[in-house]
């Protein structure tokens, strides 16, 4: 709540908040839509504790539940491909995007500008790119230009 009072628009609730009581508490304390729920998925299930502990939750179903509870957006990270320049799992992102009406930010596996475009076409409103930029696989300007044209 303190960050919102300072003028911060959104607060990301980390993957530890996969239990509904934790997210409900966070959502109840700040303005509607201000919580971005971070969902990390591995092997098709939401994971916590540094991606080591499965929860049994389907990412799309979890995203839909958090939307019902008042989350304003979802940051979806596919940790199967995170940081590996291995390419994206478009189907996983499409599943989460299709399950909710709130914005979805996609993360994990981006290796090429084409991956950025593909994620935009899933309906994701934003894409997190880390390793590809760090390793010089492409420039931010090139990714933005390609996404704008898509």
Question: Model-predicted segments: where are they?
Answer:
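Short, basic/aromatic-enriched C-terminal tail that caps enzymatic domains
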Residues: 132-150
């Amino acid at each position: 709540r303190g960050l919102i009072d300072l003028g911060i628009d959104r607060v990301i609730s980390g993957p530890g908040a996969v239990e509904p009581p934790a997210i409900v508490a966070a959502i109840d304390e700040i303005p509607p839509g201000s919580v971005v729920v971070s969902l990390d998925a591995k092997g098709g299930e939401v994971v916590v504790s540094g991606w080591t502990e499965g929860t049994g939750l389907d990412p799309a179903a979890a995203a839909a539940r958090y939307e019902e509870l008042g989350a304003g957006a979802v940051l979806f990270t596919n940790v199967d491909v995170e940081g590996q320049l291995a390419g994206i799992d478009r189907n996983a992102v499409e599943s989460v995007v299709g399950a909710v009406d709130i914005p979805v930010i996609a993360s994990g596996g981006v290796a090429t500008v084409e991956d950025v475009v593909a994620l935009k076409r899933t309906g994701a409103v934003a894409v997190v790119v880390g390793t590809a930029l760090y390793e010089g696989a492409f420039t931010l300007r090139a990714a933005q230009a390609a996404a704008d044209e898509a």
